[in-house]
């Protein structure tokens, strides 16, 4: 092996100290909520994946232990166990110095995720304790750390071994992760499965040893990203078998897989050296550019587009497309835009992906002539639907004259007095009676009320033209005023927050789900920006005493109710709210609309693949997947209504005091 790829003690480079990590963890892992907690695991897992990516090892085991700690074990080369040029044991350098890793300066890896060299030390800094066990050069080595990264032992040789690899076990520090230090099996599962899809020869096992939660899953996909696309499209009506292309250009390896379904939204998942690039980048641009050019050339060749016709827009060509674009870029070419590393900036990646797709796609279209013709016709229909969407957007923009004027005159929208779109809020309220209370109870300056009277359409099943015909959805589109679908522009929104306020019963929950499905599919940037909320009206009102000694309390959960009952003692009256209309305007303001006292749930998309699959399963045409999901996840009891707070996945933002790291 040449020096370029020699994973040794000298290939570990040190850039800076670790002191700031515990003070500002958000800078290193994004947040200290459940996303940040799970990010710790990904940092260590991605180091193991980098070993596999570079041809060392093929197995990774992740185990949630009984005590709540987690272990990540691989069968790679094992971390270097000698003395680093700085004079300290190399293992200690890797786990205690920020930016110490084999990925800086091409010392140990040809390709890697680029940002994961910081991983081990950051995880150590944010852990109550951490232990590392290394199998290398015939020996087993062990070192432990405690209290956020301080070595509690030196590197100790424990015995002999024929294996190679690294095992890291750590317990997150509950003084850093105050919300929870409990790992979620399903969240880890999605991410680990993703890694297995991207590397054909990688086998991953996920174990949960916690009492009452025992579970095990294995991930190994011999057909790689082809199976990834099938997985994403599960439950959807697909139009053809998955197509795959591979090639190399500019020293960059390119893998592409795609499949069309009968839906109206596109889903492109892009990766660089097995790391997800959520914000896309040059590789995604290359894919889209080549696809648009090749499709238009083909459409003209088969005479579906005439000389006088405009080219098809890329958005129309990609309607209903699911694609995975995976590139492997040498370390010296790897560039990201911004600090988050979620957008690729390597210019060579654009031409590499463009070249591979432009080379392979024309042959595929010629070979599948009948399918290709139907895909072109599908794109032409999408173009027509987009024109309708553009018209709706223009109507909304000129609302002072036309559509919005009609909306206002019809008595639906009660607007806010202020024109400050940075502060204004739109409440979507279930029913007229609650809408009346909300109108009277609101702060007129910045809160607008839109009562929903009719049936909200299920936008997962409906065609785009039918969505525009639905009065409730159409009113929402015009009220928000930022367009819809691919033409949605978040900067044009009339409101900083859209708040869904429904009764605390199954009908109210159904309306919430229908509205969230619409926002997720057709106003996704609004959800991604964290600007869609669910209002949380109380379930109970407790009243005791009269006159000046009268005390009124509200409870949002049964737990809060029990606490208040004990606190108030005997002699109180209890009211169970079944609907928003049972509250007078003052009560509705105080409990649900006043920014000083209300509780809101922010709707967030943490994993787009997972979210999209759930929407398809629960809101799509196919009954069997929905039945199976419900039977697996829903416990049926006598009580029909329960608080959304009973869901452990919900994180509540109270009194509008949003933590910087949660936004």
From Swiss-Prot:
Listed Basic and acidic residues bias regions: 387-398
Needed co-factor(s) = Mg(2+); Mn(2+); Ca(2+)
Residue ranges for the region (Disordered) are 386-416
**Reactions catalysed, as given in the entry:** ATP-dependent breakage, passage and rejoining of double-stranded DNA
A biological-process GO annotation: DNA topological change
Q: Which residues bind Mg(2+) 1?
A: 430, 503
Q: What CDD domains does this protein's entry cite? A: HATPase_GyrB-like, TopoII_Trans_DNA_gyrase
Instruction: Tell me one Pfam family matched here.
Output: Toprim
UniProt-annotated site: Interaction with DNA, residues: 455, 458, 510, 626
Q: What region holds the Toprim domain?
A: 424-538
* Molecular function terms, GO-annotated: ATP binding; DNA binding; DNA negative supercoiling activity; metal ion binding
UniProt: ATP binding residues: 7, 47, 74, 114-120, 341
Q: How is the cofactor bound?
A: Binds two Mg(2+) per subunit. The magnesium ions form salt bridges with both the protein and the DNA. Can also accept other divalent metal cations, such as Mn(2+) or Ca(2+).
Known EC number = 5.6.2.2
Q: Which family does it belong to?
A: Belongs to the type II topoisomerase family. ParE type 2 subfamily.
Q: What does this protein do?
A: Topoisomerase IV is essential for chromosome segregation. It relaxes supercoiled DNA. Performs the decatenation events required during the replication of a circular DNA molecule.
Against NCBIfam families, the record matches this protein to: parE_Gpos (TIGR01058), PRK05644.1 (NF004189)
Protein name (record) = DNA topoisomerase 4 subunit B
Q: Which gene encodes it?
A: parE
């Amino acid at each position: 092996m040449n020096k370029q790829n020699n994973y040794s003690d000298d290939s570990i480079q040190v850039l800076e100290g670790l002191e700031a990590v515990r003070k500002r963890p958000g800078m290193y892992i994004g947040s200290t909520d459940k996303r940040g907690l799970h990010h710790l695991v990904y940092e260590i897992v991605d180091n193991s994946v980098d070993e596999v990516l570079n041809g060392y090892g093929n197995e990774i085991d992740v185990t949630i232990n009984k005590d709540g700690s987690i272990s990540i074990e691989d069968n790679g080369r094992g971390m270097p166990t000698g003395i680093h040029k700085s004079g300290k044991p190399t293992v200690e350098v890797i786990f205690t110095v920020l930016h110490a890793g084999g990925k800086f300066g091409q010392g140990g890896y040809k390709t890697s995720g680029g940002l994961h060299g910081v991983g081990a030390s950051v995880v150590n800094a944010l852990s109550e304790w951490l232990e590392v066990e290394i199998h290398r050069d015939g020996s087993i080595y062990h070192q432990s750390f405690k209290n956020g990264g301080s070595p509690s032992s030196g590197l100790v040789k424990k015995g002999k071994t024929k294996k190679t690899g690294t095992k890291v076990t750590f317990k997150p520090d509950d003084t850093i992760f105050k919300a929870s230090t409990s790992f979620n099996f399903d969240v880890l599962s999605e991410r680990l499965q993703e890694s297995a899809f991207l590397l054909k020869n990688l086998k991953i096992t996920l174990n949960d040893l916690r009492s009452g939660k025992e579970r095990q899953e294995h991930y190994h996909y011999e057909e790689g990203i082809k199976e990834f696309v099938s997985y994403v499209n599960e439950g959807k009506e697909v139009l053809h078998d998955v197509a795959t292309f591979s090639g190399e250009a500019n020293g960059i390896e390119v893998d592409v897989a795609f499949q069309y379904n009968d839906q109206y939204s596109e889903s492109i998942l892009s990766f660089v050296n097995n790391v997800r690039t959520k914000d896309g980048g040059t590789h995604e641009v290359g894919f889209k550019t080549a696809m648009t050019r090749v499709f238009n050339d083909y459409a003209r060749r088969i005479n579906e587009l005439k000389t006088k016709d405009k080219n098809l827009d890329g958005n129309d060509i990609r309607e209903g497309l699911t694609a995975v674009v995976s590139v492997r870029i040498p370390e010296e070419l790897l560039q990201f835009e911004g600090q988050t590393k979620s957008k690729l900036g390597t210019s060579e990646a654009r031409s590499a992906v463009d070249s591979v797709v432009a080379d392979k796609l024309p042959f595929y279209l010629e070979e599948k002539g009948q399918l290709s013709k139907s895909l072109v016709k599908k794109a032409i229909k999408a173009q027509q639907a987009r024109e309708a969407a553009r018209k709706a957007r223009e109507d909304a923009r000129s609302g002072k004259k036309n559509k919005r004027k009609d909306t206002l005159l019809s008595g639906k929208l009660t607007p806010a007095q202020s024109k400050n779109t940075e502060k204004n809020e739109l409440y979507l309220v279930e029913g007229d009676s609650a809408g009346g209370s909300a109108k009277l109870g609101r702060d007129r300056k910045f809160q607008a009320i839109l009562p929903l009277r009719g049936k909200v359409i299920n936008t997962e099943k409906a065609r785009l033209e039918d969505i525009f015909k639905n009065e409730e959805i159409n009113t929402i589109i015009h009220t928000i005023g930022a367009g819809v679908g691919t033409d949605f522009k978040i900067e044009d929104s009339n409101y900083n927050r859209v708040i869904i306020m429904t009764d605390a019963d199954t009908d109210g929950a159904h309306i919430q789900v229908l509205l969230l499905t619409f926002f997720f599919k057709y106003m996704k940037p609004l959800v991604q920006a964290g600007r869609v909320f669910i209002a949380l009206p109380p379930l109970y009102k407790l009243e005791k005493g009269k006159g000046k000694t009268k005390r009124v309390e509200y409870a949002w959960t049964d737990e809060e109710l029990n606490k208040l009952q004990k606190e108030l003692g005997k002699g109180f009256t209890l009211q169970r709210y079944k609907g928003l209309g049972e509250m007078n305007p003052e009560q509705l303001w105080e409990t649900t609309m006043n920014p000083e006292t209300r509780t809101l749930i922010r709707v967030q998309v943490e994993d787009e693949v997972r979210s999209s699959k759930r929407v398809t399963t629960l809101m799509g045409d196919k009954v069997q997947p929905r039945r199976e999901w419900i039977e697996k996840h829903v416990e049926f009891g006598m009580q029909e209504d329960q608080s959304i707070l009973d869901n452990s996945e919900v994180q509540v933002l109270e009194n509008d005091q949003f933590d910087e790291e949660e936004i």
